[in-house]
C-alpha cells in the first residue's frame, strides 16, 4: 500500500470510524422475546439467555445413529471439551413410531431424557429439532415409513390425515422437551419447527404471495408445540438464501416463528459436489459465500443465525472409501468458521459434529452405512486434527464476550499493506473492542502471504505488528483482536497471535495465545511495564518493549508451550498449533457461559473431559492415548490432582503450574475371527417350490387400488409398504398355473438397490444395482425344463431397497411396479398370476424387537427366524464347509445364486478403565466376484451393508454396547450372491484406538438390556 492511502486510512480510522462505533447505541435495535418468557431474548446482535449475551457455537449429533445411551455422554463430553456452548439434535419420528398407534419414548435408546439431563450436568444449551420431517439423509427424511403409502396425503401440509398422523409424536416430543427448558432451570433454549421448509411463498419471495397451505401447516405445528408446553423461542431454518421463509422481519404473512436462520453448505453437503451446483453454483474449493447482506435484508432485528453450517459431507454410494475429509478438513474449519464471524454470525451449529452410523435401515438411498460425515468427531468416536482445529475457535468464541455484540465497520484490502489479504472489521459499540478477520482477498487462493494490519484502538490508529508481519500461510484465516477485555480489569490492546482463551485464578489473569508452528506474534497489554520469560523451550526472539502505558511483546514460537509473566500479574501462555490442539479449558461449573473465574487450564492430554474442585484437590477426567506430560494451571490452593479418580504425582513449576506424567493405556488385542467356530445355513428357502408360504410371515398382496400417487403398471399392487413391510429386503412369491415363456419385472427400490428372481428354485437373473439407478426392469426368459406342468409355478422376487427418498420423494413406492408373464411360444395370450404373497420384517409393524426397533431387520429368512440374535441355538447346524481362513481373517463362501447366513460366537475381554473402538472390515478376495450383497450383524444389530460392486465402504465401526467388551458376541453375516458365480467375502476386525479414560467402555458395553436375545416366537415366521 502506498504511504498516502495508509495515512488516510489511519486518519479516517481515528476520527470517523471510531466515532461511528462509539455513537452506535444498543437501543437502536429492539430486544425481542416471544411474549411467553424473557429468559431467552434476541436482537440484531445475538441471543440473550438470562439477560446475558451468548455466542452460540453448537454442533449436531443424532442419538438414533448411536443406539447406546451410555455413549451419548462420551459424545457430549467431547463437544463440551472443545468449547461449544450448545449442541443440537434432530429427533426421528420414524424411530419412535413403529406403527400409527405407537409412540415410544421409553424403550432402550428411545428414552431421550438422558440427553437433556447430560446437557444440564455438562453445561450446554440445546437446540431441539423434532421435525416432524428432518431430512438428515434418513429414510423418508425421518418419517415413519407407514406414512409413505399415500394414505396420509402428500405430506408436509395441513391435510387432516397427515395432521392426525404427526400429532401424537410431535405432542409427546414437545411434552418431554417442555420439562427441560431454560425457563425451568434446564438447558433447552430453542425449538425448531419443521426443517428447511422454505415454502412460505408462491413464486418469488420478493412478491410476498403466501402459500396458505404451508402457512396453515406451520401454524398447526407451532400451536401443537405451545399446547404441549414449549415456551422457549420457536425457530426455523431456511434451506438457502432464496426462500426467505418464516421470519417476521421479512413479512407478517402467517406461520412465522420467533427466530429464523439460514443453512449453508458452501463446499457441498455430499462428496459428489455436482449435486450442489443448483444451490451453490459451480464448486470451487474454498470459495466463501456472502451472508452479511442476506441477514441485513431478511432478518435485521434477529441474530445472524445458522442452524446448520457445514461440518462435513456425507459419502454417497460409490463415493470414496472413508468419505472426503479433505474437502472439509482442517483448513476448511479454520477458514470457513472464521469467515462466518466476519459475516457477523453469532449463532451457528455445525452439521454434523458427530455423524454416527446408518445402522439397520435408517438411511435414505443417498448414502451407505457410514454417516461419519467427515465430522470433527469421527464415526468411531475418535478425535483428531479437525476436532482440535475447531476447538481453537470454539474456545475463543466462548471467551470473547465482546463478539456477541458487534457492528461491521468495514472490509477490504485497504486494511492491510498486501493487496492479496483483506480484513473485515467488527466492533463492539459499547466497549470499542474490535475483531479484524483476515483472509486472502480471493479465498480460493492458498498462497503464503505476509502483511501488516491497520487497526483502530483506544490508543489510536496503529499498524501492527510494530516488528515483523502477520502471516496467512495456505487456506487460513486469523482473527486479530484489539481492546480485548480479559481478567479482572485488563485490556489486550492488540494481538497478532490469536486468542485461545483466558482464565482468572487467585484474582490473577492467565491469557492464552497461539500461532501456527514457527510463526511470530506480537501483542500489547495495557498497564503492564515489564515482563519476563518463565518458560521458553522452543521460542526465540521474545522481547518486551514499553510504549507509554503499554507493554509490547514480540515472539516467535517454534513449537510447544512458553510462559511469560508480566509485572501487572498477568501470566501469558504462548502455544504453537500442535500445543494448542492439546490445550484445554474445562469449567468448574455447569454454566454454559463458562466464566473465566471458573476455569482451569490443562496442557497435554488427548482429551480433558471435565474438572472439579473439592478443597485442595482438583479432579480431572479425560483420556490419554499414550504416555503424556500433563501441566495444570489452577488456583494455588490446589495441591493434589487426580486423573480419572486416581491421584497422580505432581511437581510445581516456577510459574505456579502443576506438572505430572500420564501413563500409556494398556494394549488391546482381539481374538482372530478365523479361530471362531463358524456355521452357516441357506437363507433363501422361499425360492423353492416346496416352500410353504402359508404362515404368518406372509401376507396376501391383493390390493387392487392404491392411494399412492404412482399407479402401478400391473395389478395387484405390489408395493411393500402397502402391506406393512418397510425395510430393506422383501420377498414376493407370485403363482401361476398356465404356460408362460418368461416374465417382465420392473422393480423400484432407490439408488443402489438390487433384486433377483427365481422360477421354481431356478435362478433367472438379477439387477445388481448401480449408485444412481433407483428402478430397473428386466425381461427374463424361462429356461427349458424349469416350468412345472399341470401344477402351480412360483416366481420368487427378492429385492433390497435402500430406504425411501427424501422430501417429496418419500412417497415413491418400494416394490414391483410391473409384473407380466410372457405368452408361451405357441400362443399369443399371456397368462396371469393367480396369487402374490409378500414377506418382510418379522411381525411387520408390530415391532417384535422394540429395543433395536423397526429399522433393524429386513425380511430375510435368517432374520425372521432370529439367527442373528444372541442365544439362538445353532447346535443342530452341520459343521460348516463354506468358510476358510486367511490368517486372522475368515472367508465366507456361497455357491450359486442364493443367500447364505453365517454365524459365530466370539468372546471379548477388554481391560477395565479404557475406552476402545472396534471396526469390522469386509472385503472381496482378489479374483472373486463382486456381484453380491452382504449384511453384517453384531449381537442382533444390523451394522453394515456391504455392496462391493457399488459402494466403497469396507470399514464398519461397531460401538461398545452393541458389542459386549467382556463377554460373548454373536457375529452374523448374510451374503446374497446375485449370480451363479456365487460369492466370497472376507471378514476381519480391528481396534481403532485405545485410551486410558474416565469412560469405561467395558462398563458401557455391559448393558445387556440393549442386546435382547432370541425367543421362540420367531419360529412362527419361517
UniProtKB/Swiss-Prot annotation:
Q: List all annotated glycosylation positions.
A: 23, 100, 211, 411, 456, 541, 554, 626, 777, 790, 832, 880-881
- Segment forming the signal sequence: 1-20
Record key words, sorted = Carbohydrate metabolism, Disulfide bond, Glycoprotein, Glycosidase, Hydrolase, Polysaccharide degradation, Secreted, Signal
Location in or out of the cell: Secreted
* Record's keyword annotation contains Repressor: no
InterPro entries, alphabetized: Betagal_dom2, Betagal_dom2_sf, BetaGal_dom3, BetaGal_dom3_sf, BetaGal_jelly_roll_dom, Galactose-bd-like_sf, Gly_Hdrlase_35_cat, Glycoside_Hdrlase_35
For biological process, the GO terms are: polysaccharide catabolic process
> Which Gene Ontology molecular-function terms are recorded?
beta-galactosidase activity
Q: What is a single Pfam family found in this protein's UniProt entry? A: BetaGal_ABD2
Question: What is the superkingdom listed in this entry's lineage?
Answer: Eukaryota
Major subcellular location class: secreted
Record's catalysed reaction(s): Hydrolysis of terminal non-reducing beta-D-galactose residues in beta-D-galactosides
**Is Glycoprotein set as a keyword in this record?**
yes
Q: Which residues are listed for substrate binding in this entry? A: 90, 135-137, 195, 265, 373
Per the UniProt entry, the Enzyme Commission number(s) are 3.2.1.23
Q: Which residues form the active site?
A: 196 (proton donor), 308 (nucleophile)
Please list the disulfide bridges.
Answer: 271-324
Q: Which GO terms describe its cellular component?
A: extracellular region
The UniProt similarity line reads: Belongs to the glycosyl hydrolase 35 family.
| Stored PANTHER family | BETA-GALACTOSIDASE RELATED
Record function comment: Cleaves beta-linked terminal galactosyl residues from gangliosides, glycoproteins, and glycosaminoglycans.
What is the protein name given in its UniProt record?
Answer: Probable beta-galactosidase B
The organism encoding this protein is Aspergillus terreus (strain NIH 2624 / FGSC A1156)
